[in-house]
């Protein structure tokens, strides 16, 4: 039988180590709403000085995104935010010319990931989850509108 707990502990790392996978020109997907990867966002923002033109997709963001605060701090667009749904936080970012809007209906989002012409690529998916269960599974939480499709991409 596979010892999932051992595998989990061997792969467990810090947010600072995890974001080292991000390179210039990559497309990142931030999970949305309650699954926004806050610790990874903060760690990635600390790497802003060493990165250029990292594209990020996300939506239903209810608090300031640290990577975009890093853009302001550096006075350059290291991280290019692409919002799938404009709500309060996204509108504020768009007014400051810090966000692009990708219009669609909410129900279309999973299909966008299935069609390569609509979503170019998903190089990295950042998502906040709860801890692993005894069977090696992670609960992705209540915010899964297109998470499965993003993972499969």
Task: Map each language-model feature to its residues.
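Conserved alpha/beta enzyme-core scaffold
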Residues: 1-153
